[in-house]
Swiss-Prot record:
Top enzyme category: transferase
Keyword terms: ATP-binding, NAD, Nucleotide-binding, Nucleotidyltransferase, Pyridine nucleotide biosynthesis, Transferase
HAMAP family with a match to the protein in the record: NaMN_adenylyltr
Transmembrane segments: none
Organism taxonomic ancestry: Bacteria, Pseudomonadati, Pseudomonadota, Gammaproteobacteria, Enterobacterales
Function according to Swiss-Prot or TrEMBL: Catalyzes the reversible adenylation of nicotinate mononucleotide (NaMN) to nicotinic acid adenine dinucleotide (NaAD).
Pfam family, one: CTP_transf_like
Gene it is expressed from: nadD
Keyword hit for tRNA processing: no
Documented EC number(s): 2.7.7.18
Organism, as annotated: Citrobacter koseri (strain ATCC BAA-895 / CDC 4225-83 / SGSC4696)
InterPro entries reported for this sequence: Cyt_trans-like (IPR004821), NadD/NMNAT (IPR005248), Rossmann-like_a/b/a_fold (IPR014729)
GO molecular function (one): ATP binding
Pathway: Cofactor biosynthesis; NAD(+) biosynthesis; deamido-NAD(+) from nicotinate D-ribonucleotide: step 1/1
Protein name: Probable nicotinate-nucleotide adenylyltransferase
Length: 213
């Protein structure tokens, strides 16, 4: 049996401990063999990143240089068109084969808006969903039909994530770090310290490049 892998996507503008530490804890809790970090290029539903694709990629390389759990995947950065999760996960499934257990990591806030994502119905055909719980967010979907969808796929044991290739939703108890890329950009713009929010190597690069000023 192949070991469970997970994909973790985002803008990472910039990458920080709020991205890395919960996922490291998650990997230990449920037994992830590796986590593929995938920065996106043109998020269809979000403002454009302040740092360039090359700069965001390099900051990620610095952040995970001493973390063998993580592997960087550049495929979305190389696209000239908008990045859609459903398309990426379909490609990943085709590469890994039909039987490999695969998961996609999202935050609880993203779960609540998940039914608005492009082709969201197809995502569980290709992967599991691992949801990192966040304080202040409800555990129920807005619409009853979406709540029924959640309950139909919900599992309370990570064993299912290893035993099945796709199709389950697992709510994980991960630590919450009150850090956001927006907060970091605001602090950097004001000249406030960010030493405790991100790896030193990333902060040094930001300062060298004069980013987020």
């Amino acid at each position: 049996m192949k070991s469970l892998q997970a994909l973790f996507g985002g803008t990472f503008d910039p990458v920080h401990y709020g991205h890395l530490k919960p996922v490291e804890t998650l990997a230990n809790l449920i037994g992830l063999s590796r986590v593929i970090i995938m920065p996106n290029n043109v998020p269809p539903h979000r403002p454009q990143p302040e740092a360039s694709s090359a700069q965001r990629k390099y900051m990620l390389e610095l952040a995970i240089a001493d973390k063998p759990l993580f592997i960087l995947d550049e495929r979305e950065l190389k696209r000239d068109t908008a990045s859609y999760t459903a398309q990426t996960l379909k490609e990943w499934r085709e590469e890994q084969g039909p039987d490999a257990p695969l998961a996609f990591i999202i935050g609880q806030d993203s779960l609540l808006t998940f039914p608005t994502w492009h082709d969201y119905e197809t995502i569980l055909d290709n992967t599991h969903l691992i949801v990192c719980r966040r304080p202040g967010y409800p555990l129920e979907m807005v619409k009853e039909q979406h709540q029924q969808w959640l309950e139909r796929h919900l599992t309370h044991t990570p064993d299912d994530l290893h035993a099945l290739p796709a199709g389950k939703i697992y709510l994980a108890e991960t630590p919450w770090f009150n850090i956001s890329a927006t907060l970091i950009r605001e602090r950097l713009e004001k000249g406030e310290p960010c030493d405790d929010l991100m790896p030193e190597s990333v902060l040094n690069y930001i300062n060298q490049q004069g980013l987020y000023r």
